[in-house]
A protein has these predicted regions:
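N-terminal, positively charged nucleic-acid-binding surface of large information/translation enzymes
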Residues: 21-280, 359-372, 376-391, 413-461, ...
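Catalytic alpha/beta core of large soluble enzyme barrels
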Residues: 99, 261-267, 271-382, 459-463, ...
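Short Cys/His-rich local motifs and their 1-3 flanking residues in nucleic-acid-associated proteins
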Residues: 212-215, 434, 514-518, 557-560
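Short, contiguous pre-domain boundary segments
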Residues: 21-30, 464-478
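Acidic, Ala/Val/Gly-enriched low-complexity intrinsically disordered segments
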Residues: 1-4, 13
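Alpha-helical recognition segments enriched in aromatics with Gly/Pro capping
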Residues: 241, 346-348, 373-385, 501, ...
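Short cysteine-rich clusters marking metal-coordination/redox-active sites
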Residues: 210, 429, 512, 552-558
């Protein structure tokens, strides 16, 4: 049969018959024009509307949520890729007769929009935003916020047309926008619910901080692709031990800008440390594994001890004469060797010296360990990473832009053993790509491990609830559950505030400066009911800065007049609440 088919096909080719079976293809096809013609035909015949409503009466329901696309620029290829998957998924269930909600979402608020508007305006600093209208901060912020709104409206229209060109079938006249009043007030409702459960709190922490945007970057925003391979200067510093002649702690750091904040040196109590004498006669404490790597064959071991034996030793630092350092020099643990907690700050023996520079105000692990051991803290940088007053000649100079000022000082004062280049993965701001620093600041959080208040028996924590919910889901592929549970296990408390920014959710937190009580309002009606001034100026405007901040309420504890905290919300609140506004009307019973 195969041979017969082959002979028949060959005879058709020779006779020219096969050529007549196919239409001639044009060599120069205008695909964009072809797309437009097809789209016009679909609109003329009402094909899209028929597709969207074909299962309107079906009892079968497939619930689909469109995670909102950021409408800040034209779509990229990754958006087209994701939207194609979404479209295929919905088409599959539509063909099977399920009723669906074909609602597109636009993610409108946040730093990503602010940065692009700053570029359009040709400005580079926060203070430039506040002077868009010369000498009028409130009018400047209002102008900036309106420019942000205009940008996202412009690109939401562009992305809508691009999506239609993809053949993406959605109810394009019914998209949801995260900047809408409904979405913002829904987040207020969510945050009030969290507060009622006892999960909202304000506290200090060492957070990743963007010195250009002058705001904190949450764990959720530190994306893998925003870690860069960078080369920085690292330093091995020699810290002289008090009361011991020519005996030093050898300590390595890849962030020299943090050295003025040094409080202690951490060691692992279970590791073996040795005192190595150089040919010069100077002696240095390092881990046993580091001797050959650091000293080669020239170093001679003269003493050996467990790390636990070194704890309590005191040393001198290179910045001890600075006013800010002198202020805390009387603390009993200042400039001392401390035991690490390996669950907080594990110490490596494969690089460095095994003795870890601990700057409580300038590192996440440092802060956590310092909190556990009751260490003092020296704040060294301002929001823009300039060194603060109280740091002598360094004050006013930028810690990240001028690391050489610290390295030069270390060399001149005899505290530098070796300075060398070090290449490592270092995080950058996900929006402006500036290298991050770590800074201790007070922020607002949702607690992951506080038991729920006002419930019968012992309340569950948010972490427990989320893990239980994750295990109820049918994950495709299956390994998704394992990844999700691992993420939930290690997730820190959720940083929900952004200091010093403008375009975003106005956090509904009113903090009394007199009695420290804070309250979380749950929506527009509650705000109107509680307002003691400013409602007339705010009414009719969107719940954004600076308009929302006209409204003041009375503290329920001491009756003081209270303003809203100046922070905006973390942008992940906006998309995270997307499940609710399209389906839930805020009524008392809800």
């Amino acid at each position: 049969a195969a041979l017969a088919t082959q002979k028949l096909f060959t005879s058709w080719v020779k006779s020219g018959k096969i050529r007549s079976m196919f239409k001639k293809v044009m060599q120069n096809v205008n695909f964009p024009e072809m797309e437009k013609k097809i789209l016009a035909d679909w609109e003329k015949t009402g094909l899209v509307e028929k597709y969207l409503s074909r299962n309107k009466a079906s009892e079968k329901r497939f619930s689909f949520l469109d995670g909102p696309i950021t409408d800040n620029n034209p779509m990229g290829v990754h958006h087209a890729w994701g939207r194609t998957y979404k479209d295929l998924w919905q088409r599959y269930f539509n063909m099977k007769g399920y009723r669906e909600r074909f609602q597109n979402g636009f993610d409108c608020q946040g730093l990503w929009v602010e940065v692009e508007v700053e570029k359009e305006l040709g400005i580079h600093q926060k203070k430039d935003i506040e002077n868009l209208v010369p000498n009028d901060r409130k009018a400047s912020i209002a102008k900036f916020v309106e420019l942000c709104k205009a940008r996202v409206m412009k690109y939401s229209q562009i992305q809508t047309e691009q999506s239609k060109r993809l053949g993406y079938f959605m109810d394009w006249d019914n998209s949801y926008y995260t900047m809408s009043d409904e979405n913002n007030f829904m987040i207020w409702h969510f945050l009030k619910t969290c507060h009622r459960k006892g999960w909202i709190y304000k506290g200090p922490d060492s957070v990743p901080w963007c010195p250009r945007c002058e705001t904190a970057i949450s764990q959720h925003e530190m994306l893998t692709e925003d870690y860069k391979e960078l080369t920085h200067k690292s330093i091995y510093m020699r810290l002289p031990l008090a009361g011991r002649k020519r005996e030093y702690l050898l300590v390595w750091t890849t962030t020299p800008w943090t050295i003025p904040a040094n409080i202690a040196v951490a060691v692992d109590g279970n590791l073996d440390y040795v005192l190595v004498r150089e040919e010069s006669g100077d002696k240095y404490w390092v881990t046993e594994e580091a001797v050959e790597r650091l000293f080669g064959k020239t170093g001679k071991t003269v003493k050996k001890a467990k790390g636990a034996k070194l704890t309590g030793l005191k040393y001198r630092g290179a910045f001890d004469n600075l006013p800010s350092v002198k202020k805390i020099a009387g603390h009993p643990k200042f400039h001392s060797v401390i035991p690490t907690d390996v669950q907080i700050m594990p110490i490596s023996t494969s690089e460095g010296t095994g003795l870890v520079h601990t700057a409580v105000s300038a590192g996440q692990e440092d802060f956590t360990l310092g909190k556990k051991l009751d260490l003092p803290m020296i704040a060294v940088i301002a929001d823009n990473a300039d060194y603060l007053p109280g740091l002598g000649k360094f004050s006013g100079q930028n810690a990240k832009k001028h690391p050489e000022i610290i390295l030069d000082h270390m060399q001149n004062e005899g505290f530098a053993w070796k300075i060398e280049n070090y290449t490592h993965r270092y995080p950058a701001c996900w929006r402006c790509k500036t290298e991050l620093v770590w800074k201790v600041t007070e922020e607002w959080y949702i607690a992951m491990d506080r038991p729920e208040k006002h419930v019968t028996g012992k309340g569950k924590t948010l972490r427990q609830m989320m893990k239980e919910t994750a295990q109820m889901i049918d994950w495709r592929p299956k390994f998704g559950l394992e990844r999700e549970l691992d993420w939930l296990l290690h997730m820190h408390d959720w940083l929900i505030s952004k200091k010093n920014r403008y375009w975003g959710l106005a956090l509904p937190i009113f903090e009394c400066q007199k009695c420290a009580n804070f309250e979380v309002l749950g929506g527009k009606e509650e705000l109107k009911k509680r307002a003691v001034s400013g409602w007339e100026k705010f009414e009719g405007k969107s719940p954004h800065k600076p308009y929302i901040d006209e409204v003041k309420i009375k503290c329920s504890k001491c009756t003081e007049t209270v303003s809203r905290v100046s922070d905006v919300g973390n942008v992940w609140l906006d998309a995270g609440i997307g499940l609710f506004p399209p389906m839930l009307i805020l009524k008392p019973q809800n």
